[in-house]
Amino acid sequence: MEKQILVPSPTDELVNRALEVKSASVSLSQCSNDQRQSALILMTEALSLRSSEILKANSDDVHRAEQEGLNQALLSRLKLTEEKLRISIEGIRQVASLSDPIGIRQLHRELNTNLYLQRVTVPLGVIGVIFESRPDAVMQIASLAIRSGNGAILKGGSEASLTNIEIVKAMKEGLSKSDIQPESICLLKTRQESLGLLGLDGIVDLIIPRGSNELVRFIQDNTRIPVLGHADGICHLYIDSAVNLNQALDIAIDSKCQYPAACNAIETLLLHKDIAASFLKLAIPAFEKLGVTLLGDELSQSFGIITKAEESDWSTEYLDLKLSVKVVSSVDEAMLHIRRYGSRHTDAIATTNKEIARRFLRTVDSSGVYHNCSTRFADGFRYGFGAEVGISTQTLPPRGPVGLDGLVTYRYFLEGDGHIAEDFSNGKKTFSHIDL
């Protein structure tokens, strides 16, 4: 049955703007590796030159958001400091230095004498990205799009509107000095335009939502365009009975507190019953000192946690200094809990038992499964992908942090010399199928 779409059709103006991006993306797909790299460097120079304007616009956005009562987690994502801007610009330079994802020959096969098949990576075309709060996402996404030969239509949250306008203005200035058309990137500014974007099938090839689970599901339900979903980040850390308690505490603190508003911060801590008391003796004062509110099940409350965890807490993404704690009897119970309440984002185990670690890594079906390290490593930049366009929690690829490799597809090229299928049907010719 055909999907029922509930959003309004795109306006003629939006269709025309999208067609401009589509046209520019065709030209961009023909640009050389050097041309795309040079364009990104020019973008970084323009962003650096306009940094004061960008930060001033962000300050205005943050002030307005505070006046409107935006929650602390979203305010944290919205705020763009000098350091965050510098890191974002450096991320673009790293993307420029990455290997070219276009034109990679994945398959080369002789089908018959002088009949050769190739499978070669090519850009997707035009990607549409809808995201909430984070203005640094504009730079990440645009750089990945240009590097991978794709046009990009961007729609940020209204709370970051002034910042996004200044960032895109700077990036377009950089592109205007390159061989790539500035129309390769386009910023949408209204909710009506973002709804219209969902109706641009035939022009837009992929939509990537970055935000709440509600946003992702709304987009999936209201577009015929393929969606690369990035939903809730309900991440877990399980601390096993065989463990270095001090190391496990360091991992837990980093996973929760290093940046609590991130989607790869843990929301639930699972403790083996044999170490729960001794671990919480160390952890409760450490977390209290950092301002973390612990919510525990009945057993963990008996070991000193004051606030009771409700059933809804196990499936809540706090994006804040809150952490649910549950005591389990085994790694199997921990994995069952993760399977029931997790979002298939990133889950970790702290243990010195290699067999337990192996079982956990091979059983937990998340896009990232870690052993003895923080969940905060679930990030394209930290993986060496450069900036990331998002994290996909779906099973089909691309999965996990999506960088350049997730923004290309492939095309089959077949070169012959007058070959016709009839000759193979009647036996005049046979397939050799030799990989070259």
From Swiss-Prot:
Pathway(s) where this gene product acts: Amino-acid biosynthesis; L-proline biosynthesis; L-glutamate 5-semialdehyde from L-glutamate: step 2/2
Enzyme class: oxidoreductase
Subcellular location: Cytoplasm
InterPro entries (UniProt xref): Ald_DH/histidinol_DH, Ald_DH_C, Ald_DH_N, Aldehyde_DH_dom, G-glutamylP_reductase_CS, Glu-5-SA_DH, GPR_dom
Superkingdom classification of source: Bacteria
Catalytic activity line of the entry: L-glutamate 5-semialdehyde + phosphate + NADP(+) = L-glutamyl 5-phosphate + NADPH + H(+)
UniProt KW keywords: Amino-acid biosynthesis, Cytoplasm, NADP, Oxidoreductase, Proline biosynthesis
Function: Catalyzes the NADPH-dependent reduction of L-glutamate 5-phosphate into L-glutamate 5-semialdehyde and phosphate. The product spontaneously undergoes cyclization to form 1-pyrroline-5-carboxylate.
PANTHER family: DELTA-1-PYRROLINE-5-CARBOXYLATE SYNTHASE, GLUTAMATE SEMIALDEHYDE DEHYDROGENASE
Protein name per the record: Gamma-glutamyl phosphate reductase
Species of origin: Prochlorococcus marinus (strain SARG / CCMP1375 / SS120)
Gene that specifies this protein: proA
